[in-house]
Swiss-Prot record:
Annotated binding of substrate, by residue: G429, M430
SUPFAM superfamilies on file: Helical backbone' metal receptor (SSF53807)
Pfam families: Oxidored_nitro, PCP_red
Required cofactor names: [4Fe-4S] cluster
Organism: Trichodesmium erythraeum (strain IMS101)
Assembly behavior: Protochlorophyllide reductase is composed of three subunits; ChlL, ChlN and ChlB. Forms a heterotetramer of two ChlB and two ChlN subunits.
Gene giving rise to this polypeptide: chlB
GO molecular function, one term: metal ion binding
EC number: 1.3.7.7
Annotated protein name in UniProt: Light-independent protochlorophyllide reductase subunit B
Catalytic activity: chlorophyllide a + oxidized 2[4Fe-4S]-[ferredoxin] + 2 ADP + 2 phosphate = protochlorophyllide a + reduced 2[4Fe-4S]-[ferredoxin] + 2 ATP + 2 H2O
Functional description taken from the UniProt entry: Component of the dark-operative protochlorophyllide reductase (DPOR) that uses Mg-ATP and reduced ferredoxin to reduce ring D of protochlorophyllide (Pchlide) to form chlorophyllide a (Chlide). This reaction is light-independent. The NB-protein (ChlN-ChlB) is the catalytic component of the complex.
Biological process according to GO: light-independent chlorophyll biosynthetic process; photosynthesis, dark reaction
Signal peptide segment: none
Length: 508
């Protein structure tokens, strides 16, 4: 166990709760001490929706520790079933309450005798997996549960839909721009003449899960959530799945060609090449923009990328392949799936970093001094401290990355959003310089603390004034080089002379 003040992927129960609260009319009961019940607050604060978060904490307190949990947990399940009339109640412990080693399966069986809805225990090892793995596992478990139930009752629909159709699997609450991506994917499918059979888990009813096998294929836009459910549906019903993320012009075209191959193999006769050409040349502005003078100004500029596997890999490819930007390193916090990530990005960047340690990532950014960062909320903080602009491309994210306006990252509209994000994330040198000369909005205090440790150096007044004269787009670099020079020589007060000496040393 490791103590951390920042986690990229949360503990396992957060993943289970994300999936359970994404479904319609599903209630989750969290068997946990008070400190673990922050999910309700987090989701209510971040997700822009009107419904309350359907999660109840069955609190582990001293009475529970003295008498055992069964009575309390069973009572809570029955009470919620009566009050909310959910279709399903999902019980999940947390890593803390798992220490008690209680037979929660028995609690579920006991409670289900007195409930109208279904009751299920989330079958997740809280010490072995993180939020994303648990979400993937819980989604598969719920899908399995309802398909087996339908089989048992004999009301599993036979055969496929008449027209080509798709299940979009993995759209969930608290995901990065998930709702916008879902809307864009539905539009894309409609343009391709493909009906959307089901979208799970977001706003899906568990009673419709029995219809999943009717689709011609499954689309898994995010590698982190949905793969296990898709693999189960493939092994059980032979439904093929496509796990190519349609992010960027090249990957969107590759995804569409794969869809063409899959539906034609099942008796359809479609050709999407004309559609791809039309979208790439006329609808998406990204292909045109990448050849424009604006984008050529970015050619060769240095960037770093960090996030979950899906977004970090897609973004690395877009920057290197479609925009000519030099990706110094690309990284992911999904250590459990590191081999896939390496295979995807190694030819598009100089170095691959696999780490869950935000300090290590911050130091890696400070070391290479990129022109822009593309990462999570944490890298945004790092960028602010280093005075390096950052575009947020992956969860975990804060409120400003749950936009009310339409901002998908997938499909052809997504390519436009990404092009804007990339271009606006780079500080344009002349613009920055002119703003400071004419006293624009960007005349903030320039001395920032270092990323690895608090700055122990004192900048004298005349040195500070000289630093202010340096154009903003290189000021951070000048400051860091000067401080490095001073530290190496044991100088505590940085004067004009020290600045000039540092400049000469770097020049030499």
């Amino acid at each position: 166990m490791k103590l951390a003040y920042w986690m990229y992927a949360g503990p396992a129960h957060i993943g289970t709760l994300r999936v359970a609260s994404s479904f319609k009319n599903v209630h989750a009961i969290m068997h946990a001490p008070l400190g673990d019940d922050y999910f309700n607050v987090m989701r209510s604060m971040l997700e822009r929706e009107r419904n309350y978060t359907p999660v109840t904490a069955s609190v582990v307190d001293r009475n529970v520790l003295a008498r055992g949990s069964q009575e309390k947990v069973v009572d809570n399940i029955i009470r919620k079933d009566r009050e909310e009339t959910p279709d399903l109640v999902v019980l999940t412990p947390t890593c803390t309450s798992s220490i008690l080693q209680e037979d929660l399966e028995n609690f579920v069986e006991r409670a289900s005798q007195d409930t109208k809805g279904d009751v299920m225990l989330a079958d997740v090892n809280h010490y072995r997996v993180n939020e994303l793995q648990a979400a993937d596992r819980t989604l598969e478990q719920i899908v399995k549960f309802y398909i087996k139930k339908a089989k048992k009752k004999g009301d599993l629909p036979e055969g496929k839909t008449e027209k080509p159709s798709v299940n979009i699997i993995g759209i969930s609450t608290l995901g990065f721009h998930n709702q916008h991506d879902c809307t864009e994917l539905k539009r894309l499918m409609a343009d391709l003449g493909i009906e959307v059979n089901e979208v799970i888990p977001e706003s899906a009813s568990v009673h419709n899960l029995k219809n999943l096998p009717r689709a011609w294929f499954n689309l898994i836009p995010y590698r982190e959530i949905g793969l296990m459910a898709a693999e189960y549906l493939e092994s059980e019903f032979g439904t093929p799945y496509i796990d190519i993320t349609p992010m960027g012009v090249v990957e969107t075209a590759r995804c569409i060609r794969k869809i063409q191959q899959v539906v034609n193999a099942q008796g359809a006769n479609v050709d999407y090449e004309e559609f791809i050409d039309n979208q790439t040349l006329h609808v998406s502005q990204a292909a045109w923009f990448s050849r424009s003078i604006d984008c050529q100004n970015l050619t060769g500029k240095k960037a770093v990328v960090f996030g979950d596997n899906t977004h970090a890999a897609a973004m690395t490819k877009i920057l290197a392949r479609e925009m000519g930007i030099h990706v110094v390193w690309a990284g992911t916090y999904c250590k459990y799936d590191a081999d896939w990530f390496r295979e995807q990005v190694s030819e598009y960047c100089d170095q691959v970093i696999i780490s869950e340690d935000n300090g290590e990532i911050g130091d890696a950014i400070a070391r290479v001094e990129p022109s822009a960062i593309f990462g999570t909320q944490m890298e945004r903080h790092v960028g602010k401290r280093l005075d390096i602009p950052c575009g947020v491309i992956a969860a975990p994210i804060h409120i400003q990355n749950f936009p009310i306006g339409y901002k998908p990252f997938m499909g052809y509209e997504g390519t436009n959003q990404i092009a804007d994000l990339v271009y606006n994330s780079f500080t344009l040198g002349m613009e920055d310089h002119l703003l400071e000369i004419f006293g624009g909005h960007d005349t903030k205090e320039v001395i920032h603390k270092g990323i690895s440790a608090d700055s122990d150096l004192n900048w004298m007044k005349e040195a500070k004034a000289e630093l202010n004269k340096v154009p903003g787009f290189v000021r951070g670099k000048v400051k860091r080089n000067t401080e490095k020079f001073a530290r190496e020589r044991g100088i505590l007060d940085i004067s004009l002379e020290v600045m000039y000496a540092a400049k000469e040393a770097v020049g030499a």
